[in-house]
């Protein structure tokens, strides 16, 4: 289980009794957050940060712990921020500044300076926030009482993103063939992608994949066909074409698993040794969280894998689609999105049907694919392009109709 470190700031100026209370309040907060985030990551309380040495130790530990995907920080008392500098400079994991308080309400009838020194987040978090900004460290800020639903929702969002970033750092992408000939936007700098995002994108000979596909047994295909008929409606009588796709899915899954690969890209111009363009095979693998990019677009395959990891446990659907053509009726403008085959069943509003239909591109046999009515509702389209000196992430709010 991946985990988030919960690091609480204080100092030894206020004495042992104050620090004991800080530790107890921190324990209760960590237990509460752990319960609220347990489906995403475990929240692990680390010793209270009271000086530069303890900060350095904690941040180094977080950076070196493969199971730690991020750090949540909060200042219970005032915590002089110079003691955070060296530790934060060591941190290599996503950082959340939780600007909150152990108590929701003030005890107006009994409040005194002891209480105010102990519960000094309004002061301490500003000091801490200043030094994080001064250091130029990218981070998220969530403000509000930690038990409130809106605050919990934002912390959960950070946890999901941190988990996806961790996944991104170890993601391997397979390119079968190269970029579609003469196409610009699908291309990109693979070296820079690995530097920026951790994506290890390498070319693999299609022949190596074809060898694995051709070694798939009839018994394995029978089992995959049983899976298909359990999940989908068989609309075609061209069963041999469907069995061919089943063989592709089995072979692809074996190849990806053997090489620790979480995303792949192919192009219809380089499918030597395959009778069909992968249809159901690609659609089903996306349904299992494997990223896919057509026309050799390794960026989209990697990005979709990361977004699917980020969306785990959430309602809705995540998958690949491509912009195609417009309906420009005034006041009713629409865009029809599609692709040759590989729209994933995550977007299905109806039970998908398996059919075999002609495909007028690629020069291959008619492929088997899943066909379904699409879902409706609000969504976000996301893409990534390489602008030469930087990557650009483009997002658009959309409505699926």
Task: Go through each PLM region and give its residues.
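Metallocofactor- and cofactor-centric catalytic cores in central/energy metabolism, strongly enriched
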Residues: 1-263
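Anaerobic metallocofactor- and corrinoid-dependent redox/one-carbon enzyme cores
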Residues: 76, 93, 99, 106-122, ...
């Amino acid at each position: 289980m991946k985990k988030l470190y919960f690091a609480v700031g204080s100092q030894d100026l206020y004495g042992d009794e104050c620090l004991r209370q800080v530790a107890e309040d921190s324990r209760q907060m960590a237990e509460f957050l752990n319960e609220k985030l347990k489906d995403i990551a475990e929240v692990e309380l680390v010793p209270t940060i009271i000086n530069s040495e303890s900060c350095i130790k904690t941040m180094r530990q977080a950076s070196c712990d493969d199971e730690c995907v991020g750090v949540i920080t909060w200042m219970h008392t005032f915590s002089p921020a110079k003691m955070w500098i060296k530790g934060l400079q060591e941190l290599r994991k996503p950082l959340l500044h939780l600007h909150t308080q152990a108590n929701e309400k003030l005890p107006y009838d009994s409040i005194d300076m002891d209480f105010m020194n102990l519960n000094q987040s309004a002061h301490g978090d500003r000091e801490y926030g200043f030094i994080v900004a001064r250091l130029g460290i990218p981070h998220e800020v969530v403000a509000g009482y930690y038990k409130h639903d809106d605050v919990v929702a934002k912390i959960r969002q950070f946890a999901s993103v941190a988990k996806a970033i961790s996944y991104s750092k170890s993601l391997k992408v397979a390119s079968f063939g190269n970029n579609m000939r003469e196409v610009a936007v699908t291309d990109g700098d693979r070296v820079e992608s690995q530097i920026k995002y951790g994506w290890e994108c390498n070319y693999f000979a299609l022949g190596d994949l074809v060898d694995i596909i051709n070694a798939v047994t009839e018994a394995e295909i029978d089992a995959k066909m049983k899976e298909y008929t359990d999940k989908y409606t068989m609309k075609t009588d061209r069963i041999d074409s469907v069995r061919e796709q089943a063989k592709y899915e089995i072979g692809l899954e074996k190849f990806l698993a053997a090489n620790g690969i979480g995303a792949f890209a192919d192009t219809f111009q380089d499918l030597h040794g395959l009778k069909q363009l992968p249809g159901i095979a690609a659609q089903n693998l996306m349904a299992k969280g494997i990223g896919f990019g057509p026309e050799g677009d390794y960026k989209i395959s990697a990005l979709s894998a990361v977004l699917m990891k980020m969306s785990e446990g959430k309602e809705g659907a995540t998958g690949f689609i491509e912009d195609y053509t417009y309906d420009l009726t005034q006041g009713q403008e629409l865009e029809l999105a599609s692709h040759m085959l590989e729209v994933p069943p995550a977007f299905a509003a109806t039970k998908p049907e398996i059919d075999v239909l002609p495909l007028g591109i690629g020069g291959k046999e008619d492929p088997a694919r899943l066909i379904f009515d699409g879902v409706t509702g609000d969504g976000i389209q996301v893409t990534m392009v390489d602008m030469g000196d930087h990557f650009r992430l483009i997002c658009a709010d959309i409505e699926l109709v």
